Regions:
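Bacterial signal peptide processing site
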Residues: 25-27
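Short, acidic/small-residue loops that bind anionic groups at enzyme active sites
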Residues: 158-189, 195-199, 323-332
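Internal gly/pro-rich beta-alpha loop/helix module
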Residues: 174-245
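ATP/NTP phosphate-donor binding region
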Residues: 46-134, 287
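Bacterial N-terminal signal peptides
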Residues: 13-22
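ATP/nucleoside-binding phosphotransfer catalytic cores, i.e., glycine-rich phosphate-binding loops
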Residues: 40, 50-51, 57, 287, ...
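Short Gly/Thr/Asp-enriched flexible loops that form oxyanion-binding sites at enzyme active sites
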Residues: 147-169, 310-319
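Accessory alpha-helical/coil subdomains and C-terminal extensions
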Residues: 49-51, 60, 66, 73-76, ...
Length: 379
């Protein structure tokens, strides 16, 4: 992988001095929850002997890092550039070298899938990534997967994997809000924590997880809530699956179907149906619906106000699109709450961007409206 030399040295020079890999003290609230919290030591995750590469510890879990670019691999002109930088400047080998402490908890190997900003992730990249994850997890020599990813569309990729991965082994998606060259870059510790979670046997069966800022969230519920703050990823009303301090602590689980429980098999899929998102607003017209239909959309997610509300103009345009064979999903632009059923498919509690992911996979499987609604209610 060819790395921009201007950023290579800066990455290690500024990242490593700010690595703080020590656990925080347990709060009184955490102590009160001890009965419901599962404490996991990453080093205890797998005791059986593994076939390993030269130089690896065969008593540590094997974690594969799949790098896709993003801010975590970004580089800026100076160490104070936290917003003016280029994503995807640092390769996976440099990311791993910047956190040598990972070798104490896992045998880590890296693979560069792409090296781009996350707004450039396409359906083709999603399929490539999903198939590669399934291929790796089918091996007895891989215990968990960590995917480094840009934060702008991280939740979409994570939810996609939550629906298509066919393994109970941990899959963790991780990113950063500050580039690798910045003062107090958050990427190295986030990456270390992600490997720690992926190494944990208690992380099995929890679907795809997102790890940032010492928090473990389900891909189903997590969303980006701030443009630049390091604590941008929130699980909102549903809460986090767990936290990371000296060890990995799980205090919650996910009840929605995921990974091995879903109907989606992408092994033979080469192309996903086109699904677009239309944003509801005052004084809207019908031309965006018409444009989407003419452009070949197979489904439309409408991000309505409040409870997925539609204006009369939008409702009429949606009915015309539906008559033309286009599936319509009502979601909400509010970010929280369940969109109650009315006329069209309800996104349930999925935000518009995740509703798009589920509708694409649903349409690749069926055109039955009731079945698609069932997917939204269960997944």
């Amino acid at each position: 992988m060819k790395i921009n030399k201007k950023f290579r040295n800066k990455s290690l020079a500024f990242v490593l001095p700010f690595m703080i890999l020590v656990g925080c003290g347990t709060t009184a609230q955490e102590k009160g929850q001890e009965d419901s919290i599962v404490k996991v030591s990453a080093s205890e995750s797998n005791e059986e002997v593994k076939d390993t590469k030269d130089g690896e510890n065969n008593r540590l879990p094997n974690v594969q890092i799949l790098a896709t670019g993003g801010t975590i691999a970004g580089g800026g002109e100076s160490n104070t550039s936290t917003t003016d930088y280029k994503a995807g400047e640092v390769g996976v080998d440099e990311l791993i070298k910047a956190v040598p402490e990972m070798k104490e908890i896992a045998n880590v190997n890296g693979e560069q899938v792409v090296n781009i900003g996350s707004p450039d992730v396409t359906n083709e990249i999603l399929l490539k990534l999903g198939k590669r994850v399934n291929e790796l997890l089918a091996s007895d020599n891989v215990d968990g997967i960590v995917i480094t990813h840009g934060t702008d569309t991280l939740e979409e990729t994570a939810y996609f994997l939550n629906l298509v991965v066919k393994s109970d082994k941990p899959v963790v998606v991780v990113g950063a809000m500050r580039p690798a060259t910045a003062i107090s870059a958050d990427g190295p510790l986030n990456l270390y924590n992600a490997v720690k979670v992926a190494s944990s046997k208690e992380a099995r069966g929890k679907g795809t997880m997102v790890v940032l800022n010492d928090r473990i969230a389900s891909a189903r519920y997590v969303t980006k809530t701030n443009t630049t703050a390091p604590d941008t990823f929130k699980a909102e009303e549903m809460g986090y699956l767990g936290t990371i301090a000296d060890d990995v602590y799980f205090n919650n689980t996910i009840t929605r179907k995921h990974t091995t429980e879903t109907d989606f098999d992408i092994s033979t899929i080469e192309k996903l149906p086109q699904v677009d998102i239309l944003y509801g607003h005052q004084n809207e017209g019908n031309y965006l619906f018409k444009a989407a239909v003419e452009a070949g959309s197979k489904g439309i997610v409408y991000a309505g106000s409040g409870n997925g509300s539609m204006s009369e103009v939008a409702d009429e345009a949606a009915k015309e699109a539906e008559d033309a064979g286009i599936e319509i999903v009502r979601s909400s632009r509010t970010g929280n709450g369940v969109v109650t059923p009315k006329d069209y498919i309800s996104a349930n509690s999925l935000n518009p961007q995740k509703a798009r992911i589920l509708l694409m996979l649903s349409l690749a499987k069926t055109e039955d409206k009731e079945k698609i609604q069932q997917y939204f209610d269960e997944y």
